[in-house]
Amino acid sequence: MTRETEYMKIALELAEKAREMGEVPVGAVVVFENRVIGKGFNKRESAQSPLSHAEIEAITEAAAYLRSWRLEDCELYVTLEPCIMCSGAIVQARIPKVYFGARDPKAGGVRSLYTLLEDERLNHRVEVVEGILAEESAELLSGFFREIREKQKLSKKQSESGNLE
């Protein structure tokens, strides 16, 4: 197993933790000198904060660990392509390399909709590696949303049958 796969597996475990909490299953880790120094998973629902994305959580923890906002010698591993907010945080943190699993066709800020991390107009550019455990990442997400749709259908049927009385 490559080190990239090893770190992405940790991110997937964090994504699973998010799923168990009813959060969109995205996980992220920041690695420094072959050690995980920051972990995060989506907490938007539990924190009721639009900023509580996995990447932001992991970057914040890593910055606290290093006592520096500059994460110049770190790598970020995330199960889903970062959005534009998280891409901005990656640039601001000066992270030089990002690995992600699945593309995000609705909100991707790295490849799908925008290429923010490689925009020459910014003062920092990031090397991007995509597709690490992409199938596993995508399946975790699609399974989560499938469960939500099934619960919504069941709830709708129950409310409709209750209204017929």
Language-model-detected regions and their locations in the chain:
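Short beta->alpha transition motifs characteristic of CBS
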Residues: 37-44
